[in-house]
């Protein structure tokens, strides 16, 4: 029972870290990143479709994303979708491919993005602490039902606290890396 609680907690904490990585990859730094356009939706014959399903997205260099549509007729729709996204990007069509240069971030925009990054990091920490609280409540419930002793509960709670500390330090590392990325010019 105790091992199940620990394993469940660890699995949930890992998912929190994965979600944090996913959220961080969507926040634009000055560097080109193909995953930046993942959430851009294109009007594909009347239905909104993710850009990654109608085009190949690659980075041609550190400051340019190259979007190659699978259908030539989609070039205009893709360009419009990128322009209308909230990313502040200006795509340029070059024949059948679309080049998306990454404009350098202004100091003001960097500070805004750092606030967003810190908020996301705090959400990750809160989520991990909530998982710890749930695990501790499950342990207390087992003690009430006399399924485990108080000593077992204490040992399990300490193990869960170690897990919590490890994953919170991982959140801090992800946060520090993203802040460093944002401050690079």
UniProtKB/Swiss-Prot annotation:
Pfam family, one: RRF
InterPro entries named among the record's database cross-references: Ribosome_recyc_fac, Ribosome_recyc_fac_dom, RRF_sf
Keyword Protein biosynthesis: yes
GO molecular function: ribosomal large subunit binding
Keywords from the named record: Cytoplasm, Protein biosynthesis
Subcellular localization, as worded in the UniProt entry: Cytoplasm
GO cellular component: cytosol
Domain of life where this protein originates: Bacteria
GO biological process: cytoplasmic translational termination
Coiled coil regions, renumbered to chain: none
PANTHER family: MITOCHONDRIAL RIBOSOME RECYCLING FACTOR PSEUDO 1, RIBOSOME RECYCLING FACTOR
Function statement: Responsible for the release of ribosomes from messenger RNA at the termination of protein biosynthesis. May increase the efficiency of translation by recycling ribosomes from one round of translation to another.
Family: Belongs to the RRF family.
Protein's recorded name: Ribosome-recycling factor
């Amino acid at each position: 029972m105790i091992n199940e609680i620990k394993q469940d907690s660890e699995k949930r904490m890992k998912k929190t870290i994965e979600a944090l990585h996913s959220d961080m990859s969507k926040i634009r730094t000055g560097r080109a990143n193909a995953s930046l356009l993942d959430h851009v939706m294109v009007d594909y014959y009347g239905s909104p479709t993710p850009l990654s399903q109608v085009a190949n997205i690659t980075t041609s260099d550190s400051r340019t994303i190259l979007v190659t549509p699978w259908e030539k007729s989609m070039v205009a729709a893709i360009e419009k979708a990128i322009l209308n996204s909230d990313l502040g990007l200006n795509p340029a069509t070059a024949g059948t491919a679309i080049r998306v240069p990454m404009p350098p971030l202004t100091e003001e925009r960097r500070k805004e993005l750092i606030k967003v990054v810190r908020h996301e990091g705090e959400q990750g920490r809160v989520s991990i602490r909530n998982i710890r609280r749930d695990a501790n409540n499950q342990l207390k419930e087992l003690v009430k039902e006399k399924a485990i002793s108080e000593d077992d509960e204490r040992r399990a709670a300490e193990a869960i606290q170690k897990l919590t500390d490890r994953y919170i330090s991982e959140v801090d590392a992800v946060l520090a890396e993203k802040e460093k990325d944002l401050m690079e010019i």
